[in-house]
Amino acid sequence: MRPLLVFVLMVSVSLAFSLEGMPNNGGDSVASITANQARRFKRNPLFSFAQHSLVDLKARACPYYCSSQIRCCLGFKCKDVDGTLKCVSKGDFLGK
């Protein structure tokens, strides 16, 4: 029980520090956001977990943007929309 508590505290502290310095990159591309995160959290042992937590999220906690490191949720596909890779539903993906 104690190791689980330590792990949960470590993750919450790591995420708190990582979200604190995150600028608003609304217009930036996914590649530049990922590159900024890589530089900022390079030494973080929980980097891969933090990386997925820092992407823009939809209401169902699915990533809005996708890349080679960030995968879409089940039922969504990664598609180039206006030069940006975004997760779209399979129905939208097949329709266009």
From Swiss-Prot:
Its main location: secreted. Contains 3 disulfide bonds. Expressed by the venom duct. Keywords: Cleavage on pair of basic residues, Disulfide bond, Secreted, Signal, Toxin. Residues 1-21 form the signal peptide. One of its GO terms (cellular component) is extracellular region. It is found in: Secreted. The cysteine framework is VI/VII (C-C-CC-C-C). Has the PXY motif between the first and the second Cys residues. This is Teretoxin Tan6.14. It comes from Terebra anilis.
